């Protein structure tokens, strides 16, 4: 009887452990797959502040380049590509959340003019579909279809991201006009240094929170350190927790100042933003321009023909 109860208890514990592991796996996977966009989406109504700064820069502190390429002009109700390039050295590795080294991911936010939006699948050409692949584009908000986000996605494969964009038609959307519009882009590579709640990730420098002497350094079993700093003037002790990943720069017995770096800076990524301009062109204006150019060309041809005819008449009169 006792053996049966023991087996039943073991079975329950195993089932509970498996369920807990599955839940943690799902939560962790969701957190990793949505990390870049979801932080901004949850914390900010608009990813671009009034100053022009894109909010991703609040968490990704290093400044890195980003580039965007769009056509100079587009016609209404047409699909075009907005190509975002996020360059970085493919050989470098970043510090992951567990302290190990891994490849960099990239992410981007594309802020289009009102009326522009992600092109529906049935409007995208086969060539463009092949270039885009299976990238999971999404709107920043269900009501903000002109703001698109992507990431994190593997940087080695997607350091260049092509957004398929559908231009609006002023005939059906009265809020849109044939004008020149700005487009804003932000792109990051690698993990951030600050979480939305203000806490630091393990992808940045850890600084001393107090001045004093390093009295003890304990290396934690799962990585990272506990550094005890003793203030000689009052005997107070402060323990700074160093997450796994960064390289320790201090040793026991060393004198520290407040905010002195305790670790190296492991960050190899960063964020950048840029802009471009695009003209929504009126087809009638294009037709008018073509008609004008054709008229000028025909006038020039007739002028040349008339001149040659006049020269022939002059030549015949001289011969006569």
UniProtKB/Swiss-Prot annotation:
Query: Record keywords: tRNA-binding included?
Result: no
Q: Chief localization class?
A: plastid
Keyword Methyltransferase found: no
| Protein localization | Plastid, Chloroplast thylakoid membrane
Query: Which keywords label this protein?
Result: Chloroplast, Electron transport, Heme, Iron, Membrane, Metal-binding, Photosynthesis, Plastid, Signal, Thylakoid, Transmembrane, Transmembrane helix, Transport
Gene Ontology cellular-component terms listed: chloroplast thylakoid membrane
Q: Any signal peptide, and if so, which residues?
A: 1-35
Instruction: Name what cofactor the protein needs.
Output: heme
Q: Which domain of life is it from?
A: Eukaryota
Which residues make up the binding site for heme? 36, 56, 59-60
Question: How does the entry describe its membrane topology?
Answer: Single-pass membrane protein
Q: Enumerate the transmembrane spans.
A: 286-306
GO molecular function annotation: electron transfer activity; heme binding; iron ion binding
Matches recorded under PROSITE patterns = CYTF
Database matches in InterPro entries: Cyt-f_TM, Cyt_f, Cyt_f_lg_dom, Cyt_f_lg_dom_sf, Rudment_hybrid_motif
Instruction: Recite the UniProt cofactor note for this protein.
Output: Binds 1 heme group covalently.
Could you say which protein family the record assigns here? Belongs to the cytochrome f family.
Q: What does this protein do?
A: Component of the cytochrome b6-f complex, which mediates electron transfer between photosystem II (PSII) and photosystem I (PSI), cyclic electron flow around PSI, and state transitions.
Subunit architecture: The 4 large subunits of the cytochrome b6-f complex are cytochrome b6, subunit IV (17 kDa polypeptide, petD), cytochrome f and the Rieske protein, while the 4 small subunits are PetG, PetL, PetM and PetN. The complex functions as a dimer.
Which HAMAP family does the annotation name?
Cytb6_f_cytF (MF_00610)
Q: What is this protein called?
A: Cytochrome f
């Amino acid at each position: 009887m006792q053996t049966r109860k023991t087996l039943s208890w073991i079975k329950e514990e195993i089932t509970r452990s498996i369920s807990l592991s599955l839940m943690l796996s799902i939560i962790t996977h969701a957190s990793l797959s949505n990390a870049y966009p979801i932080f901004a989406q949850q914390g900010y109504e608009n990813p671009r502040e009034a100053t022009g700064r894109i909010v991703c820069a609040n968490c990704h502190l290093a400044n890195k380049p980003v580039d965007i390429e769009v056509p100079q002009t587009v016609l209404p109700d047409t699909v075009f590509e907005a190509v975002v390039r996020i360059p970085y050295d493919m050989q470098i590795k970043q510090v992951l959340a567990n302290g190990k080294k891994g490849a960099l991911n990239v992410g981007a936010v594309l802020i289009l003019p009102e009326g522009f939006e992600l092109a529906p699948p049935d409007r995208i050409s086969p060539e463009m579909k092949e270039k885009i692949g299976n990238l999971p584009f999404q709107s920043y908000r269900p009501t903000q279809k002109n703001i698109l986000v992507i990431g994190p996605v593997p940087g080695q494969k997607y350091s260049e991201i092509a957004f398929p964009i559908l231009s609006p038609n002023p005939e059906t959307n009265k809020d849109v006009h044939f004008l020149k519009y700005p487009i804003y882009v932000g792109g990051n590579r690698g993990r951030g240094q600050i979480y939305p709640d203000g806490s630091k990730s393990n992808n940045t420098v850890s600084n001393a929170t107090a001045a004093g002497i390093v009295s003890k350094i304990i290396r934690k079993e799962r990585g990272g350190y506990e550094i005890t700093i003793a203030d000689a003037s009052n005997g107070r002790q402060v323990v700074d927790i160093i997450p796994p990943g960064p390289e320790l720069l201090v040793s026991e017995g060393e004198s520290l100042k407040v905010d002195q770096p305790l670790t190296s800076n492991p960050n190899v990524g960063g964020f950048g933003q840029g802009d471009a301009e695009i003209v929504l062109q009126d087809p009638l204006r294009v037709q008018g321009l073509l008609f004008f150019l054709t008229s000028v060309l025909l006038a020039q041809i007739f002028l040349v023909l008339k001149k040659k005819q006049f020269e022939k008449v002059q030549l015949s009169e001289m011969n006569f």
